[in-house]
Amino acid sequence: MSIVVITGAAGLVGSMLRPRLARPGRTLRVLDIAPLTAGPGEEAIAASVTDMDAMTAACRGADAVVHLAGIPGEASWERICDLNIGGSYVAFEAARRAGVPRVIFASSNHAVGFTPRSDFPVPDYAFPKPDTYYGVSKAAVEALAAMYHNRYGMDAICLRILSCFPKPLNVRMLSTWLSPDDAGRLFEACLTAERPGFRVAFGVSANTRGGWVSLAEARALGYQPQDDAEAYAAEIIAEHGEPDPDDPVLRCLGGEFTLPDDQVPRR
C-alpha cells in the first residue's frame, strides 16, 4: 500500500491526473481549499497549502507529494508570493517534517518563458528566463526543490509543464500541448523512477509540430509520450489560421505571457 498526496487536487490538472494516477494498492490523499469529493481509492482533505499544520498532517505516512497547488497564471506579486512561493515552501517543508522521501513539483515553461525561438529546443536545465511573476515563482520553487534535495536528500522533480488541457486550444498548443493521458504517464514515471534525485524536465506530448523543448530528462525518468496535437490541427487551423512565424505569441516559449503587461492574461 502506498500513499500519494496531491495538492491542488480540485484544479484542472489535478482533476485530470487523479483518475490517471489511481492504482490498486495506492491511496490518493487529495487536498484542496476548494470543495472536492473523494473518488475510489481517495481520501479528501479540505485545507490550504499555506497551512503548515494541515499539510504536515496530510503528509504523514505518505510516499510522495504531487504539488500542483497555486495560482495557475499571472497575478499580483503579493498573491504569487503568498500562494505559489509560500505555499510551495510549506509543501516541501511539511513533506520533510513528515518524512516523505519524494516531491514532484508542477513547474512551468514560464520559468524559462523568455527563451527565444532561436534557442529551441530549450534544454532541460536551461537557466531561468521567467516571463511573469508567475514564472518567477516557478523558477524560485525549482531552486527551493534543489535545496531540499541537496540539504535533506529528498527526491525532488520539477516538471516544466507546457500546455496541459483536455485538447489544444490554439495554434501555439499544436506545439506545446500535454495531453491528460500523457500527463498521467509523466507523473506516474516520476512516482516510480528509482532514486531520481533532483531533476528538471519538460512536460509535453509527442507533437508533430513540437521540438520546442528537450524531452531527454523526461524520457530518462521513464516517460513515453503517446499523444500528438496534430490530431486537432485541421480543427485549430480552420478556426485560427496557419501559424504566423512573426506572431509575437510565437516568438518565445512563454507565448502570450511574454506580451506587454496589459496583454498578459491574469488570474
Where are these regions (language model features)?
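N-terminal Rossmann NAD(P)H-binding glycine-rich loop of SDR-like oxidoreductase domains
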Residues: 4-24
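Conserved active-site helix of classical SDR/Rossmann-fold NAD(P)-dependent CH-OH oxidoreductases
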Residues: 19, 88-89, 139-146, 150, ...
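NAD(P)H-binding glycine-rich loop region in Rossmannoid oxidoreductase-like domains
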Residues: 37, 47-83
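Glycine-rich NAD(P)-binding loop of the Rossmann-fold in SDR/ketoreductase-type enzymes
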Residues: 50, 79-90, 98, 128, ...
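Catalytic helix-loop patch of NAD(P)-dependent Rossmann-fold dehydrogenases
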Residues: 82, 117-156
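Conserved Rossmann-fold NAD(P)-dependent oxidoreductase catalytic core, especially the SDR/UDP-sugar
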Residues: 90-129
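Alpha-helical substrate-binding/gating segment
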Residues: 161-167, 177-198, 206
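Conserved C-terminal active-site "lid" loop/helix of NAD(P)H-dependent oxidoreductases
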Residues: 199-201, 208-224, 236-265
